Amino acid sequence: MSFDQFVGTKPVEERHRFDTARLDQFMRSNVEGYSGTLEVAMFKGGQSNPTYKLTAGGQAGGKNYVLRKKPPGKLLPSAHAVDREFRVIKALHGVGFPVPRPYALCEDDGVIGTMFYIMDCVEGRVLWDQAMPDMTKSQRFAIWDELNRVIAQLHTIDYKAVGLETFGKPGSYLERQIGRWTKQYQASETQKIEAMDNLIAWLPKNIPAGDETTVVHGDFRLDNTIFHPTEPRILAVLDWELSTLGHPLADFSYHCMSWHIPAGKFRGIEGMPFEELGIPTEQQYIDLYCKRTGRAAIDPSTWDFNMAYNLFRIAGITQGIAKRVVDGTASSAHALEAGSKAPLLAELGWLQVEKILRRGTGERAPSR
């Protein structure tokens, strides 16, 4: 699969254009150090919040910024919360976690049509292909190890100390999220997916015991990070739209979904020759995370539940993308392809439930 379609910028599509003069005026008043003639382009990657590259051409050498905004049109409740993105980025930047420098949040729809925020444009590598075909074995391992280090760092930050104690509701995260994504999925439903119906019925009744609360990213994956141009070092973690206070295992298992999705399907690496490529096995990756966070070994059924939940959640997210294509509000020409993955992801989620049932550690499955 070629990832060229996602890389770089493109001219701003008609439905995503806005008044650059009003934006320029806002930036002069709210963005420290900004001056010059503003040029605007749109990033190709992503299907969620429209993201723009802003270039202040009049400054010495030019200065680049990134603008993230809500998409136009009718939106699902609580979706596209760019104000929450800005809040968590600002808090984490203050304690040295790798995020772009935040500049300003604008909640006035009258400036460019929707709420938006502006942050620094971090220059580096965005790696889209988890196979990393142009890297050596040791280089691949170093990239995966850095991803592991950074998500472990996130989950060990004291959310109260960084002012995020009201960023979400502590406790009962999985229960609330299953309810939320059930509602979001049902609001976006365009076809019947039997595996999703089964997950909706089974998951709330089988939540594992034990609860923890940390800052969670919600979409931590390779292509939501920017690596140093030459070093295996993350300079910035991007796309905090789904961030909240939640259970770290739910967040980490989401990050590990790739080991459960066949290679070539939706960022999957299942079936790849891990040792040959220098990619850690899932268990090796879990062990690294546990060591870095001071966590004991994770119960297999607890892990499988979290994996089932996350495959259910991402199926719901992709179904939301499919619905936005139908409604005409999707912000990417490739959103239709992403939205079509919902049935596959739901089936993979149900496979995790079947593993739990074979161990005899979950309630009987609904009739299929």
Which ranges hold each PLM region?
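Catalytic activation segment of kinase domains across protein kinase-like and atypical kinase folds
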Residues: I226-Y254, A263
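ATP-binding pocket architecture of kinase catalytic cores
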Residues: T37-V215, H228-P232
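Catalytic-loop of the protein kinase fold
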Residues: V215-H217, L222
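Protein kinase-like catalytic domain
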Residues: H93, H155-Y159, L238, C256, ...
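Active-site activation/catalytic loop segments of kinase-like enzymes and analogous catalytic loops
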Residues: A250-R295, Y309-D327
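Helical subdomain adjoining the active site within ATP-dependent kinase catalytic cores
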Residues: A296-P300, R313-R368
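All-alpha amphipathic helical-bundle segments outside canonical DNA-binding/catalytic cores
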Residues: G168-K169, A297-Y309
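Juxta-kinase regulatory segment immediately upstream of eukaryotic protein kinase catalytic domains
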Residues: S2-Y34
